[in-house]
Amino acid sequence: MTSYIFVLLVGLVAGCVSGVIGTGSSIMLLPVLVFSFGPKQAVPIMAIAAVMANVARVAAWWREVDWRAFAAYALPGAPAAALGARTLLVLPPRVIDVALGLFFLSMIPGRRWLARRNFRIRLWQLAIAGAAIGFLTGVVLSTGPLSVPAFTAYGLSMGAFLSTEAASSLALYISKVVTFRELGALPPSTILQGMIVGASLMVGAFVAKRAVLRMSRALFQHLLDGLMLCSGLSLLWAALE
């Protein structure tokens, strides 16, 4: 019972964080889920919780979703996520952790360099990013920070970024959950645990909306940089252990 209470509290905080900066809940919750339920159950539990969290973020920012960007990203990304989930056990996770960690760290100065040059990507480039990130989403637990440079380079920010990223991630995670179900990795107990964790993330997402509405664009960008710094360092740390 104590472990469930702790998971729910961390989930509420993680929901608030991801509701403000668009991602990060998986990174915050993973150690807690592994400790409470074991590593085998942690990934499918987080996948179900992520579906619920993204539903809440889409509902909170429904009117600001960029549906063209969503379609360009999610249509190639969803089948790629299913393919990634099927190859989860084939690729060495340590190599992936190192590569993603270095990428996140490099994108902190990289995003600022691109912003100074007013770099923008088009819909077809966003579709390529969706396919690549979708595949990685199927392979590893969290690739949320990867979508940050993709959607911001397309020109989205604040509510439009949060809602469109959430809608796109929702499509990818549904594909991943369906694949887990087909592979027999989602017994009823795991589904229930995922829904309990997801409920706390949903509450946090709605709480965070007020903070975003009062936030300046500069502070929002600083928070994104902070997330990528923490994400990159945590992945490199995991790879070294």
Which residue stretches match the model-derived regions?
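A helix-boundary/kink motif common to multi-pass secondary transporters
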Residues: G22, G38, P92-I96, S157, ...
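Membrane-interface helix termini and inter-helical loops of multi-pass transporters
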Residues: A85-R94, F180-L192, A239-E241
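Transmembrane helix exit motif
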Residues: N54-W62, A85, P93, A99-W124, ...
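Residues within membrane-spanning alpha-helices of integral membrane proteins
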Residues: Y4, A47, L100-F104, I108, ...
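Small-residue-rich segments of transmembrane alpha-helices in multi-pass membrane proteins
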Residues: P31-V32, S36-K40, L75-L83, M107, ...
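Cytoplasmic-side transmembrane-helix entry/capping segments in multi-pass membrane proteins
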Residues: D66-G77, D97-G101, I121-G130, A160-A167, ...
